[in-house]
């Protein structure tokens, strides 16, 4: 694939062009609709320490970094995100709370819900959890043991012990738990390739 040699932003723009020109129109759960392509892959060379952020659209990169750190922590509760001003995951537990508790036609606002999440640890524990989303799958993949499999620790150990392995992979797509997640993973499988010690 020639695009794999392109700068990350050029890969993204090329993908957007292909989706616009040849993508199939599809309906989605949000009612917005999409143009879709099947099986597209983007490859990023991270060996120089760069991060593939876009400059052609507004990116809330600080929130993205906070979210990634939250994933890597293994947490599944929105409380740490909300405490840092990251609201990207609030809608799912808020909708669940409103469906269970709000009087008809008077749901609690996002601001009021987030304030309760911050102020009340018990409320956050009950209503702020997203189920076994990214962080849980990455750090506690269920295997019958109390802590599960820490895919991130296993990945790092594998890269250090056997850099040439083709098995430097982790995933968030756990078919057995998709229905328990607030939202199934959008980005779900990652593979690392070590070449010449990098």
What are these regions (language model features)?
Residues 1-198:
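Terminal, non-catalytic protein-protein interaction segments that mediate quaternary/complex assembly
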């Amino acid at each position: 694939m020639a695009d794999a040699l392109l700068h990350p932003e050029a890969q993204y723009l090329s993908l957007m062009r292909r989706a616009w020109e040849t993508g199939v129109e599809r309906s989605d759960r949000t009612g917005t609709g999409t143009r879709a392509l099947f099986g597209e892959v983007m490859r990023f060379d991270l060996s120089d320490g760069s991060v593939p952020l876009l400059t052609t659209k507004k990116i809330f990169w600080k929130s993205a970094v906070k979210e990634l750190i939250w994933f890597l922590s293994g947490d599944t509760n929105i409380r740490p995100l909300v405490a840092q001003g990251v609201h990207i995951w609030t809608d799912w537990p808020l909708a669940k709370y409103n469906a269970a508790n709000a009087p008809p036609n008077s749901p609690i606002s996002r601001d009021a819900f987030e304030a309760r999440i911050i102020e009340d640890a018990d409320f956050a524990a009950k209503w702020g959890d997203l189920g076994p989303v990214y962080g849980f799958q990455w750090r506690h993949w269920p295997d019958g043991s109390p802590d599960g499999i820490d895919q991130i620790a296993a990945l790092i150990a594998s890269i250090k012990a056997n850099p040439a392995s083709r098995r430097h992979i982790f995933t968030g797509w756990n078919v057995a738990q998709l229905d328990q997640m607030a939202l199934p993973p959008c980005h779900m499988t990652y593979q690392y390739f070590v070449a010449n010690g990098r």
